């Protein structure tokens, strides 16, 4: 059995970033009973509304990526579609709307990014070291 066959709606897939080290990328699985796709927010995406949230086949999403981990959540197809409709015109932004913001808005109901917070702490540490 292939991994994609074991995925269910709401599974959050953490993968490597394409061409960038020291980061990860998130997508969330949508299963309509006929096919499984992955919704995600990427600076390389452009949907028909000009935003950066797109739905792709699992195979397309996984091109040039490696799975880091998969987390099962209680997010439903409705949750995914509702959040995607609300932000359909928004463009990926590393500070305000990255892949983690998008997926965690679906799963938790609000935006947040652990990766961005880690980079902020690292930048603050560098500034403090330089100031000393």
Q: Where are the regions that the model predicts?
A:
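Detector for Asparagine
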Residues: 41, 45-47, 77, 98, ...
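Generic hydrophobic secondary-structure packing signal
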Residues: 23, 79-80, 99
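Short linear sequence motifs
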Residues: 51-54, 71, 85, 95
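Glycine-rich catalytic cores of cysteine/serine-nucleophile enzymes that process amide/ester linkages
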Residues: 4-69
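Activation targets extended, charge/polar-rich intrinsically disordered C-terminal tails
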Residues: 83-132
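Histidine-anchored, small-residue-rich loop motif
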Residues: 59-89
């Amino acid at each position: 059995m292939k991994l994609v066959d074991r995925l269910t709606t709401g599974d959050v897939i953490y993968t490597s970033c394409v061409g960038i080290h020291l980061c990860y990328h998130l997508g969330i699985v949508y299963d309509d009973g006929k096919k499984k796709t992955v919704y995600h927010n990427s600076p390389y995406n452009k949907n028909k509304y000009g935003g950066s949230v797109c739905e792709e086949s699992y195979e397309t999403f996984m091109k040039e990526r490696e799975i880091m981990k998969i987390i099962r959540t209680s997010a439903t197809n409705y949750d995914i579609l509702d959040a995607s409709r609300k932000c359909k015109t928004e463009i990926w932004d590393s500070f305000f709307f990255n892949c983690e913001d998008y997926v965690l808005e679906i799963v938790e109901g609000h935006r947040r990014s652990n990766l961005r917070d880690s980079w902020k702490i690292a930048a603050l540490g560098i500034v403090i070291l330089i100031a000393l």
